[in-house]
């Protein structure tokens, strides 16, 4: 079981490393143009770290698709991670 944890974390680590590379080498060449706060790349890192590589990547893709001139942008934080709560019905 101890060996599985690093393997499960590997996709998350690789995705974050890729995004950090984009932030360091590509984004400065493009200039600041993201209409959202946090930026799309920061949002992607936060989403992947909070929700995991699959759901976090899906949230990041949805965010990037919203980043266009017809969308007003603004503050758009990563959604909180939902927890399952068992509700008991009172009698």
UniProtKB/Swiss-Prot annotation:
Give start-end ranges for the coiled-coil region(s).
none
Give the record's keywords alphabetically.
Cell inner membrane, Cell membrane, Membrane
Q: Region Disordered: what ranges?
A: 72-91
The family line of this record is: Belongs to the UPF0161 family.
InterPro entries xrefs? Membr_insert_effic_factor_YidD
Function, as annotated, reads:
Could be involved in insertion of integral membrane proteins into the membrane.
Q: Major location, coarse class?
A: membrane
- Pfam families annotated for this entry? YidD
**What GO cellular component term, any one, is given?**
plasma membrane
> Would you tell me the protein name for this molecule?
Putative membrane protein insertion efficiency factor
Instruction: Tell me where it resides.
Output: Cell inner membrane
Q: How does it sit in the membrane?
A: Peripheral membrane protein
Per the record, the domain of life is Bacteria
Which NCBIfam families does the record cross-reference, listed alphabetically?
membrane protein insertion efficiency factor YidD
Organism per entry: Pseudoalteromonas translucida (strain TAC 125)
| Compositional bias segments (type: Basic and acidic residues) | 78-91
């Amino acid at each position: 079981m101890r060996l599985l944890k690093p393997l499960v974390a590997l996709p998350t680590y690789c995705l974050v490393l890729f995004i950090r590379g984009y932030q360091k080498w590509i984004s400065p060449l493009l200039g600041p143009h993201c209409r959202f706060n946090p930026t799309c790349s920061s949002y992607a890192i936060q989403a992947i770290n909070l929700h995991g590589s699959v759901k976090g990547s899906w949230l990041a893709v949805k965010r990037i698709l919203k980043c266009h001139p017809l969308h007003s942008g603004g503050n758009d934080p990563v959604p909180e991670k939902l927890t399952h709560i068992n509700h008991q019905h009172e009698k």
